[in-house]
Amino acid sequence: AMAMQGSCISNVDVGSATVKLADDGSFNLIIGAADMGTGCDTILAQMVAECMDCSVDDVAVFGADTDASPYDSGSYASSTTYITGKAVEMACAKLKTQLCGIAAGMLGCSTEEVVFENGRVKQINTEKSVSLAEISVKDQVNNDIAAVATASHSSPVSPPPYMVGMVEIELDKDTGEVKILDYVAVVDCGITINPALARIQTEGGIVQGIGHTLFENITYDRNGRPIESSFLQYKVPTRLDMGHLRVEFENSYE
């Protein structure tokens, strides 16, 4: 079987992010999306780390607080990766420009003469450079350039991830019992940012779909009361019911 689920709602969803240089030269990422198991905290921290030439350990993520966080349409499907992820990239680009402005003043040169490289701001054609920690200190004394940037993003398109699923079952024709022996899924979801998280997300979706098809059902008695009133009667699949489960990714550019 083949299925497709969009990455977001085009021309509707909005993702926002704030990236701030902390006192010790690390970064704070403030987002409006809540990590409900989508893995967005980890994935967006990875994006900051790549954009700012630092370790993921140097990025502290602060999740949704509607009183303080920048606006986000919410977490579902791949929206936080595709929409909020772009907002993170844009915020990092803004922050780099601002850090270069602060560093240029410290180095006594123009912003055109500096470059952000390997977590430092260097003066071109010289050995002079300043660290992020040094920039952070300068940011707090006699400075009019903020070491924080916010960006929002909305997309006119929604990339269509595809999945193909193939399953081998064992069927008892007398009782109707179905056993899952082997399930193989091949997923094209663009560029996989975090394969481990994407794999378990896919496995969870597969198990949920199998549960809806083969296990879960609600019936009612003659008085209209549900018979499956607890998990003692309402059967949900576990990993032991799944047999061999395999997930492979086919990367493509969105």
Model-derived features: where do they sit?
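Residue-level recognition of alpha-helix initiation/capping sites
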Residues: 39-40, 94
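A short alpha-helix capping/helix-coil boundary motif
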Residues: 24-27, 79-80
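Residue-level signal for tight coil/turn positions that link beta-strands
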Residues: 23-24, 118
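Conserved beta-alpha junction segments in alpha/beta enzyme cores
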Residues: 1-23, 31-33, 38
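C-terminal catalytic domains of large/alpha subunits in multi-subunit enzymes
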Residues: 1-7, 46-254
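A broad, low-specificity signal marking well-ordered, structured residues that form hydrophobic/aromatic
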Residues: 17, 27, 245
